[in-house]
Amino acid sequence: MMDWTDRHCRYFHRLLSARALLYSEMVTADAVIHGDRERLLAFNPHEHPVALQLGGSNPARLAEAAAIGADWGYDEINLNVGCPSDRVQEGRFGACLMAEPELVAECVAAMRARVPSHIPVTVKNRIGIDAQDSEADLNRFVETVAGTGCRIFIVHARKAWLQGLSPRENREVPPLDYGRVCRLKAAHPELTIVINGGITSLDEAEAHLQHVDGVALGRAAYQTPWLLAEVDRRLFGTAGAAPSRRAALEALLPYAERHIAAGGRLNNIVRHILGLYHGQPRARAFRRHLSEHAPRDGAGIDVLQEALALVEGHGAPALAAAE
């Protein structure tokens, strides 16, 4: 998700789940080719498995960007054919490409040819756009792209209106149609179909997994990140208890110290953890303290320690930033 799932967000989420596949923000192919790759593509090895999501519509440039992403160590290369924003449409990528399945297939084929065979090239799409939203349209899109060898589709269970709705409205106004995604899977058992859109709990995720192969969580994972702490046990069958919220913060401290020592700002990290105590007593005090103090010049990990003391009680001992 653009402006959300940067490297700091992903590192934090990995502290909560060892197994969930994490996605980068969408990066345009041209930015990958011509931009600051260290800033755009670098990530901590602890983030694995991590996917690079690309935006674009030029097969040759997408292929080059995909090859670069593979060289940087990403575990999956994903093509975004689901974002409906005006800015994205002006660049001729995102959801508007669902009107051109043959072009998407050409892009995916070019990417596949430049990426090692063990790295999946996947597509994220909607169930339709504008008036092109029948099940036949969705099946044609998926079948056309699958003909290139693409085997994984992450399907947002809403259509997108390319005109008249903001990106936020496109996440809320078009009705969810989970049944259509389930029927897509039933029609194509050979494909891996991952459902996305409006899923806010692991109970819902478990219900969907009776019909599809995977579940993609977006805003729920960001706004209430603690739900990721139960993902390994409930969805992957991993033994052992989830880490505590305190333990997650303790594990984040050395990372934050290194980032600050390298010239970074504490708020680059803290803005992603504001929802950690969502629904817990004194969560508001936790968020308020971080929001007020982390953006300040010179803010250090003491801000995190103070916020923890507020949320867990004033008698909570300060954390030590130990490796």
Language-model features: locations:
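Glycine- and other small-residue-rich loops at beta-strand/loop junctions that grip anionic moieties
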Residues: 2, 54, 96, 100, ...
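Alpha/beta catalytic cores of nucleotide-metabolism and tRNA/nucleoside-modifying enzymes
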Residues: 2-3, 8, 106-109, 114-116, ...
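Glycine-rich, aromatic-flanked loop segments that form ligand/cofactor-binding clefts
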Residues: 19-35, 77, 81, 95-106, ...
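Glycine-rich tight-turn/loop motif centered on a GG-T
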Residues: 86-104, 135-136, 164-177, 238-239
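Non-cysteine beta-strand/loop elements that form the S-adenosyl-L-methionine
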Residues: 24, 75-85, 147-160, 217-220
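Glycine-rich, positively charged N-terminal anion/phosphate-binding segment
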Residues: 1-75
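Conserved radical SAM core fold
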Residues: 28-33, 56-59, 82-97, 159-164
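A cross-domain feature marking catalytic cores of carbohydrate-active enzymes
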Residues: 26, 54-56, 81, 123-127, ...
